[in-house]
Amino acid sequence: MTAKDIIFDSDARAKLKVGVDKLANAVKVTLGPAGRNVLIDKKFGAPTSTKDGVTVAKEIELADAVENMGAQMVREVASKTSDVAGDGTTTATVLAQAIYREGLKNVAAGARPIDLKRGIDRAVKEVVAELRNISRSISGKKEIAQVGTISANNDPEIGELIAEAMDKVGKDGVITVEEAKGMDTELKVVEGMQFDRGYLSPYFVTNPETMEAEIEDPLILIHDKKIGNMKELLPILEKSAQSGRPLLIIAEDIEGEALATLVVNKLRGTLKVCAVKAPGFGDRRKAMLEDIAILTGGTVISEEKGYKLENATLAYLGQAGRVNIDKDNTTIVEGKGTQEDIKARINEIKGQIDKSTSDYDTEKLQERLAKLSGGVAVLNIGASTEVEMKEKKARVEDALHATRAAVQEGIVVGGGVALIRAIKGLANAVADNEDQKTGIEIIRRALEEPLRQIVANTGTTDGAVVLEKVKAAEGDFGFNARTEQYENLVEAGVVDPTKVTRSALENAASVASILLTTEAAITDIKEEKSDMPAMPPGGMGGMGGMY
């Protein structure tokens, strides 16, 4: 086992503080509309330019082990806030640094760390309650655009695109961000349900120019097993041919005799038909087939449920207004399922999302939810260079997360003003002793720090003067760092999602409290590398002839 180095008390706390400050100082220059960019060296490829706090934090690794522990604890604040709310990582870092700095002063003066922590926890609880109290819900396209614009570092183009995407696919819709081939940033919306399976044979194509199969008003057969035998498929084929409507077959696979017969009949014109593989794998495939059945008003023909393909009737088949199929994707538009069934399925999936513990499962469930409830929007991000594109794509992803957070929990006034207004919630925080009261005061002081930093980053205005002016006012009045004017910030479009501000404070207080109650730090002792040259290979020379 490697030998360990242990440092205690003020020595440990001082070194941890150095690490906290190094990381926080690098991150906080990015805060606010006047925040600067940070350039990050990459071993492979071009350097990355970013104004995203968590991206900066994740790149920082310090040489001193104890300092690095302090830095990594604050990095955790940024990462957790990013995971939960998608934005507010720089605010969280600034708050964590301020809480730890103020707390250390009091620990050095003899305050009990555990009581400071209790005071901090009680203060945060009351501030969060006050934030929820002053929060307002958003619904309009304009408000959504404002949140997106602020989170994308005051880029109104991105804000408008996100608002338009949400307008098209709904608040639960899936919005994906991809790199565009050209320089233009644009929004593309896929209506209806799309899944990533194309036609099984190019002979099913109806439009040779686009190489797509376009089927109007089809019947849809949904089967969860492979179809290889024509005998079991024949009865339902005859029934659908008699109805005069085209048929789309979705099954685990269609092969051999069955596929060959479908192709021949399609080419002869006796049957309007197209076949595709079912999307997904395993249990997820079953769930997605059930989604398609509910959307189209059909039934999954599954032996598990007691249905056999040879006994299927037209009543089992789903229906849709239109289906478009290319070599990679199938899109079902205007499914004929009942709204009650679709709504019940949506609520069922929402329940599964709430219970899900896996990020991957949650993402897949949200995709299914979106496909049932509206469609999928794709934001194609264009830029003139790869460096700019990556930076812009990261900003769009941040803005998208923040906008979703705003829809969930509402918005508060931005520019650091919401935390100033939430200070009045501290009047409800109860302290059992002087040290707990000090913990509450630490939060009071820390809540001012984001506003101070936003002003400091403008480089032209005194933070103390702005702070006093904002504290003396009420409501949405604050300092707009972009225009350097005092005004109603909500009317000016300077807003933050409540979830972002709340998560930033809760995560910052949590990690800063752990650091404050730390009394010892244990690290590996670095082994001194020997300066002796290595022994030449081949053993002892000059001993030839000895036996």
From Swiss-Prot:
Domain of life: Bacteria
Single GO biological process annotation from the record: protein refolding
Pfam families: Cpn60_TCP1 (PF00118)
EC number assigned by the record: 5.6.1.7
Cellular compartments annotated: Cytoplasm
Chemical reaction(s) catalysed: ATP + H2O + a folded polypeptide = ADP + phosphate + an unfolded polypeptide
Keyword list, A-Z: ATP-binding, Chaperone, Cytoplasm, Isomerase, Nucleotide-binding
InterPro entries, alphabetized: Chaperonin_Cpn60_CS, Cpn60/GroEL, Cpn60/GroEL/TCP-1, GroEL-like_apical_dom_sf, GROEL-like_equatorial_sf, TCP-1-like_intermed_sf
Keyword Isomerase attached: yes
GO cellular component term of the entry, any: cytoplasm
Residues that bind ATP: T30, L31, G32, P33, K51, D87, G88, T89, T90, T91, G415, D496
Xref: CDD domains: GroEL (cd03344)
Family: Belongs to the chaperonin (HSP60) family.
Function: Together with its co-chaperonin GroES, plays an essential role in assisting protein folding. The GroEL-GroES system forms a nano-cage that allows encapsulation of the non-native substrate proteins and provides a physical environment optimized to promote and accelerate protein folding.
PANTHER family assigned: 60 KDA HEAT SHOCK PROTEIN, MITOCHONDRIAL
Subunit description: Forms a cylinder of 14 subunits composed of two heptameric rings stacked back-to-back. Interacts with the co-chaperonin GroES.
Stated name of the protein: Chaperonin GroEL
Source species of the chain: Chlorobium limicola (strain DSM 245 / NBRC 103803 / 6330)
Lineage: Bacteria, Pseudomonadati, Chlorobiota, Chlorobiia, Chlorobiales
